[in-house]
């Protein structure tokens, strides 16, 4: 994935502004500041999202965008069956759970947008 990301950045002409790593995110440390943190299609597969949200909060990125799949859409049950049958747990959320997770993880400034299948969260430091 890192090779693909590097190739895409090179093709887009932004390779000098990008750095990609594969690592244990919860244990990782980098002295460089971040402009943004993205977690799109990530919390679908994380049993304990609070640990990651707290770590993302500690990055001090000025803008963060997260997605959380909605519980009880037409897509929920077929997706749950298909993924679990293949040994891949998947997790779904309701709006109050997303807001609770965010606040308990130290996020105070956020907008939760209701999309058709997901909640899209724009979180900010201030």
Which residues make up each language-model segment?
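Class I SAM-dependent methyltransferase SAM/SAH-binding core
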Residues: 1-27
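Conserved S-adenosyl-L-methionine
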Residues: 107-118
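Short alpha-helix
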Residues: 87-106
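Conserved beta-strand signature within the Rossmann-like core of class I S-adenosyl-L-methionine
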Residues: 60-71
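A short SAM/SAH-binding and catalytic strip from SAM-dependent methyltransferases
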Residues: 35-48
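Short conserved loop adjoining the S-adenosyl-L-methionine
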Residues: 27-32, 47
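A short, conserved alpha-helix within the catalytic core of class I
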Residues: 45-59
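Short, glycine-/aromatic-enriched active-site segment of Class I SAM-dependent methyltransferases
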Residues: 70-89
């Amino acid at each position: 994935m890192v090779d693909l990301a590097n190739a895409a950045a090179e093709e887009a002409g932004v390779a000098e502004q990008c750095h990609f790593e594969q690592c244990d995110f919860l244990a990782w440390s980098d002295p460089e500041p971040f402009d943004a943190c993205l977690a799109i299609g990530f919390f679908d597969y994380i049993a304990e999202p609070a640990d990651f949200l707290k770590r993302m909060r500690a990055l001090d990125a000025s803008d963060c965008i997260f997605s959380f799949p909605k519980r009880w859409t037409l897509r929920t049950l077929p997706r749950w069956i298909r993924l679990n049958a293949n040994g891949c747990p998947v997790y779904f959320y309701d709006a109050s759970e997303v807001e609770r997770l965010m606040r308990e993880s130290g996020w105070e400034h956020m907008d939760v947008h209701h999309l058709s299948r997901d909640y899209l969260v724009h979180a900010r430091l201030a």
